[in-house]
Regions:
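Amphipathic, small/basic residue-rich leader segments at the start of a protein or domain
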Residues: 1-82, 102, 109, 367-370
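N-terminal glycine-rich flavin-associated loop
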Residues: 78-98, 124-127
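C-terminal helix-coil-helix/basic helical segment that borders enzyme active sites and/or dimer interfaces
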Residues: 20-31, 259-266, 282-315, 325-333
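Glycine-rich beta->alpha junctions and the first turn(s) of the following alpha-helix
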Residues: 2-6, 190-285, 349
Length: 370
């Protein structure tokens, strides 16, 4: 089960009121929604809903929240998902007892924010392309390198950074390191422009011989590849929920528009052509929902299946948003319905958590092997 209808109905009004009030006070669309984050934590304790008892599967309640919020403010859902999947989940799932004691509660309460750095601007067919290195020292580690894209970056207190480590036998190992962002040698780049998800800041970050304590290695073990693959899988599941929320938001706003009486007391939805077009969009949305709902049967043993769901749900979000714009775009000046924001957000989600093209390449690999 990936969606709780009862919970969604109970929370829908409160969620929309909080988001509406935030939009009224927001100075600009680039503003990081920190105040709204604190309100959601205080009102709903949202991050305590993250995991089930096995600490390995995103809970239905959390996915429901993410999807519900995305109907009105997808960028805020992405901020929450980043904190959850790039901060809380990795430490709770893989951290040592000391790491859990130091970070989990402050992360859940929103007292510290986290991000994850793994991309270096190259297609990651394997971890061999990673150039960021962690060198063992007498007292811990020295981290050097650059990550090209890190979400929530300049607002984070800690970053989880994937780095290459040369082991004693000369082989390369990979580990995830917990880095306090106030450490000397940590430098954030300028904000990276993107079409949508405004309010979710993305930056590069450079590490110049950053000195880390010995216990900064996540789980105190070089298990970076397994950890990263699991983290990305959880993120893609959350991004699928965001995509369905975007589809629902665009569809519902478009439907509300065509159900309003216009000139001569007529509604657009009274025309057969609009009825058929919205029926097609609704069918497409239902297909995406069904695909998403099937994920838990295969999620643990099949990461590619989760990637395929992410690919399809984002594609549907883009298509529904584009079609709604095409149907009501010429008339949209009559109503304040920012449908175009859904399209921009959907296109940005498509490249987050491994891009659509990288997923397509991975799917196609099974057919081109010798």
């Amino acid at each position: 089960m990936t969606y709780n209808d009862v919970l969604a109905r109970e929370l829908s009004t409160d969620v929309r009121v909080l988001i509406r009030d935030y939009f009224k006070s927001r100075e600009d669309e680039q503003q990081f929604p920190r105040e709204l984050l604190y309100q959601f934590i205080e009102r709903f304790d949202i991050f305590s809903l993250l995991l089930d008892s096995q600490d390995s599967v995103l809970r239905t309640e959390f996915l429901t929240f993410i999807r519900l919020i995305s109907k009105d403010f997808p960028a805020f859902s992405a901020v929450l998902l980043t904190q959850a999947c790039y901060g809380i989940y990795p430490i709770l799932r893989y951290g040592s007892q000391e790491q859990k004691a130091s970070y989990v509660e402050p992360l859940v309460r929103g007292e510290i924010l986290a991000g994850l750095g793994f991309s270096e601007g190259k297609l990651m067919d394997s971890l061999e392309v990673i150039a960021t290195t962690a060198r063992k020292t007498e007292t811990g580690w020295s981290l050097t390198g650059k990550k090209s894209i890190v979400s929530n970056c300049r607002y984070t207190d800690i970053l989880l950074i994937l780095a290459k480590v040369q082991e004693a036998d000369g082989e390369d190992g990979y580990g995830v390191f917990i880095v306090d962002t106030i450490r000397p040698g940590v430098t954030f780049g300028d904000d990276i422009a993107k079409p949508g998800l405004q309010g979710l800041p993305v930056n590069s970050v450079t590490f110049d011989q950053v000195i880390l304590p010995e216990d900064s290695l996540l789980g105190l073990t070089l298990n970076g590849e397994t950890q990263l693959n699991d983290i990305i899988k959880k993120l893609q599941l959350g991004l699928s929920a965001i995509s369905i929320g975007i589809s629902e938001g665009a569809f519902e706003k478009g439907l509300a528009f065509v159900k309003v009486k216009r000139g001569f007391g007529k509604r657009l939805i009274d025309a057969t052509v609009y009825q058929h077009q919205f029926a097609d969009l609704y069918t497409k949305l239902c297909a995406a929902e069904a695909y998403f709902a099937s994920c838990k049967d295969r999620m643990e043993e099949d990461s590619l299946f989760v990637s395929q769901i992410k690919l399809y749900t984002t594609k549907v979000a883009i298509e529904i948003s584009e079609e709604i714009i095409r149907l009501i775009g010429p008339l949209q000046t009559l109503d304040d319905i920012p449908i175009d924001r859904y399209l921009k957000d959907a296109k940005t989600v498509e490249i987050y958590g491994k891009s659509g093209d990288s997923i397509r390449k991975r799917i196609a690999a099974q057919w081109i092997k010798e």
